[in-house]
Structure formats: C-alpha cells, structure tokens
Amino acid sequence: MDKKTLCLYFQVHQPIRLRKYHFFDIGKNSDYYDDFANRTITRKVADRCYLPANRTMLELIRKYGKNFKVSFSISGMVIEQFREYAPEVIDSFKELVATGCVEILAETYSHSLASLVDEGEFKKQVKQHADLMKELFGVKPVTFRNTELIYSDEIGEMVARMGYKTMLTEGARHILGWKSPDYVYTNSINPKLKLLLKNFRLSDDIA
C-alpha cells in the first residue's frame, strides 16, 4: 500500500488587546494596551494549550522519529507576549525545532493584512519576522504562510521574489472547482513558487 503524506501546520498567534480608551483620555493618557488582559490570556493559553500541545508533539516525535513532522507559523505579536508573560513556551518551541522534525514558517510579523495594501510594508514585516525566527530558532524560513492564508497570484509573485520556495493557501472550493486540494500547484506568474493548499474538510474534522 502506498504511504500517504499528511502535512500538519499549526498557527500560533495572540493579538495584543487594547484597553477601553475614553474620549477624555485623548491627549492625557497614551497607555493604549490592556496589560492585565494580555498577561492573563497569554498565561491561560500557555498553560492550557501551547505547553500541553508542544509536550504531545515532542512525545510523538520521540516515538515516531522522522515519520512525524509538523510546521508552525508563529507571529511576532505572540512571541512578544511569550517573552513577557510565558517564556517557557518559547523554550518548548526551541526544543521541538531542535529535533529536526519541525519546520518554522514565515509570515508577517504583526499577523497583518499588509499584502493587500502596501507592498513595502508587507516586505518589511516579512523580513522582520524572518529575522526573529532566525534569532530565536536558528533557522531561515523557506515556506511562507500569509495572514489567514490570503493569496492571489500577485501576492504569490511578491513572495517568490522574496526568495520563498513554497506558500500555503486556502483550498477554497469556489476557486478549485473540481480540482483537489491534495496536490501541489504552482503560481501562474512565477511557476517556481509551489502552492500547498489547505484541505478544509480534513482540517475541520481534526480541529
């Protein structure tokens, strides 16, 4: 029986929460962030989600070796909060990367929509994120995942020009039609960029 390959990728992101900012605060208070909510939520998801999940991933890697591999897309925003409130989460990702069975993906630093509005800002954030991944994990990402898997051939061509070999995107039914998301496609402007599509049915089943 032919072996089937399943590509698992996990998005890791937490937004920075803003506090309630009243009209009379204008000009008097520049403390925009809700530090209490950011700390509380980051600690909660670290203890209930990220740390247990990473322990499970590590156990599976130790059990199955190179036959079990995963990838993570970790935003700059969540790294900032991990550094402040839950540094042990970063350590757990470092331990996973050190196994050689984990790929770190590139994305925009701020989990932003810059690819839709400003090419310069988009490139700046992608480089900022890639530099952070290199600093933390000692790896240079070669696969790109845009915010919410946003894709167009023009965005893909930009990504290819930045040196990325592969890009993840949504396997949207209204785009694919009769085609399957379970194949490797290419960018129509720059065919050197490979496209891996999300199988939304399978993702929904295991989420």
Where is each model-derived feature located?
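Catalytic alpha-helical scaffold of carbohydrate-active enzymes acting on polysaccharides/glycoconjugates
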Residues: 1-142, 149-204
